[in-house]
């Protein structure tokens, strides 16, 4: 049984381009899985360093966008999900709506703007408050 309250699925830049300490603090009650970018292993190493972690989970790559979304949805399991991607299909949006407050979808290319980081912080704060 996991003690995590949520899972974060995102590209490396969301974490490597965040302010110092933001990702580590935000992930205190969660876990991360990276969707690799064009930099591949180098960007995954950068995430591990940014998190001061010895290992980082990676979401399995798929042949097409629809299959990739299904993999992320399966990875979410019963936990709340923060999912950052450049866009979402109608199927992914419908899935997120069915999960209601358990899912936060954020459309962003590369790093996360400050206003979106605040949305993530509020979401995590709500989850932490419910778990207390």
Name every feature range the model reports, one short phrase each.
Residues 1-67:
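Alpha-helical substrate-recognition element adjacent to the catalytic core
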Residues 44, 48-132:
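C-terminal cap/substrate-recognition subdomain and adjoining C-terminal extension
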């Amino acid at each position: 049984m996991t003690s995590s309250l949520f899972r974060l699925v995102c590209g490396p830049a969301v974490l490597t381009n965040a302010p110092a300490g933001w990702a580590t603090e935000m992930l205190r009650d969660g876990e991360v899985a990276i969707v690799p970018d064009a930099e591949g292993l180098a960007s995954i190493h950068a995430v591990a360093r940014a998190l001061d972690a010895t290992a980082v989970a990676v979401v399995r790559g798929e042949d097409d966008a629809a299959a990739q979304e299904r993999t992320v949805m399966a990875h979410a399991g019963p936990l709340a999900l923060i999912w950052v991607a450049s866009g979402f299909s109608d199927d992914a949006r419908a899935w997120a709506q069915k999960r209601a407050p358990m899912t936060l979808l954020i459309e962003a290319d590369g790093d996360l703007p400050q206003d979106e980081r605040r949305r993530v912080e509020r979401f995590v704060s709500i989850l932490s408050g419910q778990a207390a």
